From Swiss-Prot:
This is RAS guanyl-releasing protein 4. The gene is Rasgrp4. It is found in: Cytoplasm; Cell membrane. Belongs to the RASGRP family. Residues 1-10, 20-32 have a biased composition (Basic residues). Residues 201-432 form the Ras-GEF domain. PANTHER family: GUANINE NUCLEOTIDE EXCHANGE FACTOR (PTHR23113), RAS GUANYL-RELEASING PROTEIN 4 (PTHR23113:SF157).
Length: 673
């Protein structure tokens, strides 16, 4: 028996004896590296230095910060404690109270003639204002206390101390600003930049989405993160609310762009394009936008489109499943966390996952121990998580952005849709099949709209600015000769970037020159964007110009509808009446009435809008706009919206004779004949 056999036999005997005692020996690591959690714990305790105990008082913490500075204003040791206190104190102590304690300490040191301590306190306040200037402007009470502090220094301090309070050297901006948009390399002056979604390369689209995401991520401050953790909501945190709104906008934009295509094969092309965009986002390590795009592709309103998914290639289907697995919430996003831990260089996190970690860490331990002292390890752990996120804001994106394409994406993401509207459009594209179908292979990785209620609905001023920027970009690239107009073909392709076609907001037919001026394009985009962004589809009334037989009043301004013929407009679905100039300002939801039997009665009766009888097409001129349910037809969806223009307007709607009143269904209706 050789030596190895002897050792093996002895090990077996030992294990047998242990098993005989009925208690298995616990496996112990031997000569192995510590886990990352253990390394982080040790490093955190080392960074705390003399405050490595589990608790300390506010005065002890403040005293340690004062001692960090020497007589020349240099840090005697590392700045970890100083940065942690200045970043995290507002979690347990108002900033104005911290400043008041510094003022009291300075006055006491001046009374005892401790000039070095006075100077150290001045250095601390100066460091605070220089590196955390945004906190001062957000708290008026803190500004008042700081002002009193420097007034006291001017009265009781020496020349060296007073020089530190020079306002011209304080409040310097901290951190890099958002990256400036740059034109694509090699872009000549006469070369047109394609502003068409179908012409945008997946690489280009992913880069511009990454730029928008990084610009939004850079605006988030530690105060925003603290507000979310303490309140459990993004309300009151504009930068964080904007970041969440951007993610939700991207997700819904993906859904509506897919549903805006009439045929399954066309929808599959859009699906395939967004899958390739998601793959490129993965390569760019932009996980937040990747989550939004993948969530939009896996949304139940999209995954139920069986006819569309049939046209996807096996490679695209496999890629989507892999991305879904990467962002799955299974085991607390274990797959994503492993991938994120191995990332280096430029990267953007899934913000919702990391905010969830902050909330869990905050709720796990109390702020103070039973004796009233601060729980220092908790504050330090929260600071390390915040510092990790803040460090990512100083990155430099690996890609450039074209300003014109940014304007296009910005306006596209401004559009607002509710879940009900998206589902309604999904069922209009592919109605329910009575036969049982196999379940969809796609699983939603998470609830994409992780902050519910955050809906990106811009105000009219912001929307107008975005439209003006886009129109300027369009004419810069599509009208290089400066004629002041673009062709009908360019107009139709440009309007195809937006899912207006889903709601009857097609480019209006043109007569004569067939070109569109800057004013006409601006009017079209403002009109369509305002409806889709601010009112939502439920507010769209099917207005028609009518002649009232009885005295009728405008529902919007309460004015009398007077005239000989065609005094105003009335909605075909709910019966609401208004002036021509008031129809775009109606803020009442269109509630479609159930179909009634018998004589509907005379039109124009002053009864509530929800119970007003339908129009009699035999006695009034009416315009009918219906939604074609055939997804494969070559025609556009015909127009179940409309805040219609009059027949002599530059946007002339299609006139369809209406011999009999037939109420269309909510999802779709048969074309009028």
């Amino acid at each position: 028996m050789n030596r190895k056999d002897i050792k093996r036999k002895s090990h077996q005997e030992c294990s047998g004896k242990a098993g005989g005692r009925g208690r298995s020996r616990q496996a112990r690591r031997h000569k192995t590296c510590p886990t990352p959690r253990e390394i982080s714990k040790v490093m955190a305790s080392m960074n705390l230095g003399v405050l490595s105990e589990s608790s300390c008082s506010e005065d002890e913490l403040l005293e340690e910060c004062i001692r960090c500075f020497d007589s020349a204003g240099s840090l005697r040791r590392g700045d970890h404690i100083l940065k942690m206190v200045l970043t995290m104190h507002s979690w347990v102590l108002p900033s104005s109270e911290l400043a008041a304690r510094l003022l009291t300490s300075y006055q006491k040191a001046a009374k005892d003639a401790q000039e070095l301590r006075q100077l150290q306190i001045c250095y601390l306040v100066r460091y605070w204002l220089t590196h955390h200037h945004e906190a001062v402007h957000q708290e008026p009470q803190l500004e008042a206390v700081i002002s009193r502090f420097w007034t006291t220094v001017a009265q009781e301090g020496n020349m060296a101390q007073r020089s530190l309070g020079d306002a011209s050297s304080l409040l310097s901006p901290g951190g890099p600003g958002p990256p400036p948009p740059m034109s694509s390399p090699g872009l000549g002056k006469k070369r047109k930049v394609s502003l068409l979604f179908d012409h945008l390369e997946t690489e280009e689209l992913a880069q511009h989405l990454t730029y928008l995401e990084f610009r939004s991520f850079q605006a988030i401050t530690p105060q925003d993160l603290r507000g979310y953790v303490l309140q459990g909501s993004v309300r009151g945190c504009p930068a964080l609310e904007g970041s969440v709104g951007l993610s939700n906008s991207v997700s819904r934009w993906v859904q509506v762009m897919v549903l805006s295509r009439p045929g399954p094969a066309q929808r599959a092309q859009v699906l395939d394009k967004f899958i390739r965009v998601a793959q490129r986002l993965h390569q760019l390590q932009n996980f937040n936008t990747l989550m939004a795009v993948t969530g939009g592709l896996c949304h139940s309103a999209i995954s139920r489109l069986k006819d569309s998914h049939v046209h996807l290639s096996p490679d695209s289907t496999k890629a989507l499943l892999e991305l879904t697995e990467l962002l799955s919430s299974h085991n607390n996003y274990a797959h994503y966390r492993r991938t994120w831990a191995g990332c280096t260089g430029f990267r953007l996190p899934v913000l919702g996952v990391h905010l969830k970690d902050l909330v869990s860490l905050y709720e796990a331990h109390p702020d103070r121990l039973p004796d009233g002292r601060l729980h220092l390890p908790k504050l330090n752990s929260l600071y390390l998580r915040l510092q990790e996120l803040m460090a990512l804001q100083g990155q430099h994106p690996p890609c450039s952005a074209n300003e014109d394409l940014l304007h296009l994406l910005t306006l596209s993401l401004d559009l607002f849709y509710t879940e009900d509207e998206i589902y309604e459009l999904s069922y209009a594209r592919e109605p329910r099949c009575p036969k049982s179908l196999p379940p969809s292979p796609f699983k939603a990785p998470v609830v994409v709209e992780w902050a519910q209620g955050v809906t990106p609905k811009p105000d009219s001023v912001t929307l107008g600015q975005h439209v003006e920027q886009l129109v300027e970009s369009v004419f810069k690239n599509y009208d290089p000769e400066g004629r002041g107009s673009i062709s009908l073909e360019d107009f139709e392709r440009l309007s195809g970037n937006f899912p207006f076609a889903c709601h009857g907001l097609h480019p209006p037919p043109r007569h004569g020159s067939g070109s569109f001026s800057r004013e006409e394009l601006t009017k079209y985009l403002l009109h369509a964007s305002a409806i889709c962004s601010k009112l939502g589809l439920a507010f769209l009334h099917a207005f028609q110009e009518v002649t009232f037989r009885k005295p009728t009043f405008c529902h919007s301004c309460s004015g009398f509808l007077w005239g000989v013929t065609k005094q105003g407009y009335r909605c075909r679905d709910c019966g609401l009446c208004c002036h021509r100039h008031c129809r775009d300002q109606v803020r009442v939801e269109c509630k479609k009435r159930p179909e009634t039997k018998g004589d509907p009665g005379p039109p124009g009766a002053p009864v509530p809008a929800t119970s007003l009888p339908p129009a009699n097409c035999g006695s009034e001129e009416s315009l009918s706009y219906t939604l074609s349910p055939d997804p494969e037809s070559g025609c556009h969806l015909r127009h179940a919206w409309t805040q219609t223009e009059s027949s002599h307007s530059s946007w002339e709607p299609e006139v369809v004779p209406c011999p009999a009143r037939v109420l269309p269904s909510r999802a779709s209706s048969k074309p009028s004949v």
